Amino acid sequence: NVGNVVAITIDDGVDSSVVDAYLDFAKDSGVRLTFFVTGCYPSWTDNRDKMRPLVESGQIQLANHTWTHPDLTTLSEGGIIDELTQCENLLRNTYGVTGAPFIRPPYGGRSSYTDSVCAKIGYTTTTMWYGSFGDSGLLTPEVLLGEAQKWLLAQHIVIGHANFPTVTSVYGQIIDILRQRSLQTATLDDVYFGPGHNRHV
């Protein structure tokens, strides 16, 4: 039922152990996740062997969050293309997939100009969010859960971050929220293209 779907999207990947814990969470719970990869962080190669089967099955989708997390509105056309291309190359070389068409601009920094430059290289869907775990910085489990309670609702794209370990202590409570609300999780591919979308290159 499309009406009861929420898309949980996880950005950055500063902390490799948090990415690893998210993979356990996905394997143990069946939750479907979209990672917006910031390619310069080692977590995306550190966790390759564990992540690849989940990417292959489509339970986890990988999308582009640039190489070094700059505000795209401060860059030239060449700078934007370089940031996206380096991350795209990582996704292709490490996982055999493309991140296109989904780009999430760091800090939400976008304009009609940045959108048009991204589209030139296949990144036609600038993906923002409606709701956040609030965990781009360090916060307490109680605050994070409060944000999860507030935003894990049908038809929402919710943003979290793989940067600090707080979220890893509340996975059980996140599952409880999803079950209480009869919510199904979906990747962006599930929502935009339907199950089984092939992003192999």
For every predicted segment, state its role.
Residues 13, 38-40, 67, 106-108, ...:
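Active-site beta-loop-alpha junctions enriched in small/polar residues
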Residues 1, 29, 42-43, 166-201:
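C-terminal domain-boundary segment and adjacent tail
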Residues 1-71, 79, 83-93, 97-100, ...:
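Active-site beta->alpha N-cap acidic-glycine motif
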